[in-house]
């Protein structure tokens, strides 16, 4: 049998007869973070997502020397950066719920290809963009990026950390399954080892660690919402143990992280629900949720501890248990917390056509419960726990009346005196494997003017009034982080946390990266204007 070795390559190749085997010898690797945004997970600065941390942990397990850089930092120093000193480069990116970002510019696969075009080592792709579902930075559109994915040697369709582990263990691309998912038992080591990467982030220590509690969704029992990738990727919920989550947070906290979002799940109120594999709207497991958050507080003293998603149907249909969960979140989390409700539509025809399940009555009840339990103002200047509402357009069954129905329900919420922290309005993307088709998108294009009209109407007639209710004039917002200088006498900043308010700060002598206390003096449509309070004795809490 003819055996030949080719060694003048960053990827050593062995040819055995007619077979070509690529042998991996990775001593040094780079993680290039192009950011991620998914239905149940965020990895755009100021957040550091789970993908780079877990990938770092898998590489560290095999004693690989790992560097980490964000795409924004890489663009700054690209001319001086020698990529060929690495045996492997792991690129992370992908968007299933694209948004607008104040101080970050995510990468695309096309950009990654242009960066690595002359790179000789192993090229690995991870994150949502590596999956069959695709990625989109723009609502209502999705591009065919298969030609860019083909550029990479390894495309982690499953879990990036699992693929990296197998690659390093086996030493050969041909022996690994790019579709493999990791178990929570093996994830524990990756998560704890990967905590070290936070110190390599250019914004350290001012970053928020996104923490995973579970993935999958009870809605998978009937296929899930028509547009959503979560149940299609992960099926029914698989829960992470409280101890594993707490231990990861302890390590991250000891590495200097003081900001956390327990955000990588479709519904915080459904964590460890006993009937999650039998019921689409499972009863909250109050004991498990208290064990988790109490445990987090026992090992850390975070400046920010927030959540993300919550299913309003769970809150409304299990009122007693949900009130207890909300009280736990108020007790252990910091104020300014937001439970994002995936309402998507108040139109019952759209709800039925897209298997959304949650009714308008569910939403109104859930909004009422969180306002009653979480509406008191806390030390940050914001209420402890408020709902957010996500609305999605371009769904099946959408009609002209849908826009009016959605607006009327938002108006009812306002007229009843409730507070909503944010209203997120976006267009659906036809991801692979979901029930949304290009035909649905083309139909939605015909209603583009209606969509823009609706968005403008909500911003003018709901958002502005709601801001004045959530943060009345005179409210002091503590620890606003100065991020951008717009002009000589105007800066923009935000507090750390879930869905922070954009604050325009009227001042001439601020520094980017400093924290200031700001008094609310005026309002934009979705932002506020404030002035710095420098005399601590003048600080008071409004409401």
Curated annotation (Swiss-Prot):
Domain TRAM, residue spans: 470-534
- Know the name of this protein? Uncharacterized protein MJ0274
Gene Ontology terms, MF aspect: 4 iron, 4 sulfur cluster binding; catalytic activity; metal ion binding
Could you list this entry's UniProt keywords, alphabetically sorted.
4Fe-4S, Iron, Iron-sulfur, Metal-binding, S-adenosyl-L-methionine
Judging by the UniProt lineage, the source's domain of life is Archaea
Q: Per the database record, which ranges form the Radical SAM core domain?
A: 203-460
SUPFAM superfamilies reported for this sequence: Radical SAM enzymes
